[in-house]
Regions:
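Hydrophobic, well-ordered secondary-structure elements that form the walls
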Residues: 6, 74, 94, 156, ...
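A generic secondary-structure signal for well-formed alpha-helical elements
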Residues: 10, 98, 181-185
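Short glycine/proline-enriched loop/turn "hinge" motifs that connect secondary-structure elements
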Residues: 62-69, 147-151
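A conserved FAD-binding loop/helix module that cradles the flavin
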Residues: 159-183
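Flavin-binding catalytic cores
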Residues: 11-12, 38-48, 82-121
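Mid-domain catalytic core of redox enzymes
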Residues: 1-65
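Conserved FAD/dinucleotide-binding core of flavoprotein oxidoreductases
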Residues: 7-9, 66-93
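A glycine-rich dinucleotide-binding beta-alpha-beta segment and adjacent secondary-structure elements
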Residues: 49-53, 100-164
């Protein structure tokens, strides 16, 4: 994953009014463009027109930015461990759907896959999902258990993108871990 955090002078100037009201926007273009981007990553190449996830929480939480300003974070898929700087491609992709987006940028912080792994050793190669997401892996972390949120230590539970239902289903890992803990009370 290649991630950029932004400080903006105002909200993202989306062409679509619906995007201006969404906490998260998936920017991909046509189905063919999305498929081409993901195929490039699978082949070990940086995508020309990346599939970009855009999170604009300051629209709903005013404590995330000073009055009149906004924060934003974005990411796109890149090959495992890639050192390619996707800033230009990622911002160009956003500008296709939000003209003059770059004019709103006050500051940016770029995180490459290597930096993401340095930040969190579970993000091997920049993979925010904690590695392989197949059925076997989901039920064998950290040990083989019927309830993947429990640990061998009584009363200790865990959740992350490495537990079911996996990354991209925000909050559900924590919800299921809490349910498992409550059942054991």
């Amino acid at each position: 994953m290649f991630k950029i955090d932004y400080a903006l002078d105002g909200p993202v100037p989306w062409k679509s009014e619906e995007c201006s009201r969404a906490g998260t926007v998936h920017v991909g273009g046509t189905l063919a463009e999305i498929a081409a981007a993901e195929l490039a990553v699978w082949r070990g190449e940086p995508p020309e027109k990346p599939f970009v996830l855009v999170a604009q929480q300051s629209l709903f939480d005013s404590t995330r930015a000073p009055a009149g300003k906004h924060t934003l974070w974005t990411y796109c898929h890149v090959p495992n461990g890639s050192s390619f700087d996707m800033t230009e491609r990622l911002e160009s992709q956003i500008e296709r759907f939000a003209p003059d987006f770059r004019d709103r940028i006050l500051a940016r912080h770029v995180s490459t896959p290597v930096e993401l792994e340095r930040y969190n050793t579970n993000y091997v190669g920049g993979d925010i999902n904690g590695g392989v997401q197949d059925l076997w892996q989901l039920y064998t972390r950290p040990t083989i258990r019927l309830v993947p949120y429990s640990t061998p230590a009584r009363g200790i539970y865990f959740c992350s993108s490495s537990t079911p239902p996996g990354g991209g289903v925000h909050g559900m890992c924590g919800y299921f871990a809490a349910q498992a803990a409550l059942r054991d009370l």
